[in-house]
Amino acid sequence: MSVFGLVGLQDARALQRLMESNAGYAVRIQGHGVEPGAAQEALTALPPNAVAAQKRGYGLWEGNRLLAFADVIIGWPEPGTAHIGLLMADSERVGEGLGRRLHEAIVTELRGAEGLCCLRLAIVDANADVAEPFWKKMGYQPTSQVAAHRQGTVESASRIWRRKLGCGAEASAGPN
């Protein structure tokens, strides 16, 4: 049985293994496989105008094995919003609902907390065929916001998707 918990720098080795199990994702968004140190980068990288105190790593653990990971920035890019920078599940466990379970645990963790009303993420066009069906099932909808995506050898677009999280009276009304 998997357990939801925080993921920090001390867990970089477990996250690196998870990322290496998903080399296809790295190829789609940056044009090459997972680099050494990718986990450390995922655990420390911040978007513009964010500070380290806003960053949270969440995971599903089975013993010492990290089965799924999400990088969340609280209150970014504006107060009331949490941005999911990455959500990844073990490619050896496809079909077990790990991504969905991690997302549900994050929603439960964040719903009504810290004045958050919205979850936000960016889907890179080069990864959209894989990502969009999952995020639609999780209740996200595309917005009109689009930004350029340049990483490694990949030049693409990044599209912002959002879903309500619930805040105040909304939070006690249940799922959105």
What are these regions (language model features)?
Residues S2, L6-E92, R100-A105, E109, ...:
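Acetyl-CoA-dependent GNAT
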Residues A38, V154-E155:
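Short Asp/Glu-rich motifs
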Residues K55, E155-W161:
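Short hydrophobic/aromatic beta-strand or adjacent loop that forms the aromatic wall/cage
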Residues P79-T81, C118, S158:
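A generic structural signal for beta-strand entry/edge sites
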Residues V94, R120-E132, H149-V154:
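Conserved beta-strand-loop-alpha-helix junction that forms the acyl-donor binding cleft
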Residues G97:
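Glycine-rich phosphate-binding loop
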Residues R100, D125-S144:
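Conserved active-site alpha-helix within GNAT-family acetyltransferase domains
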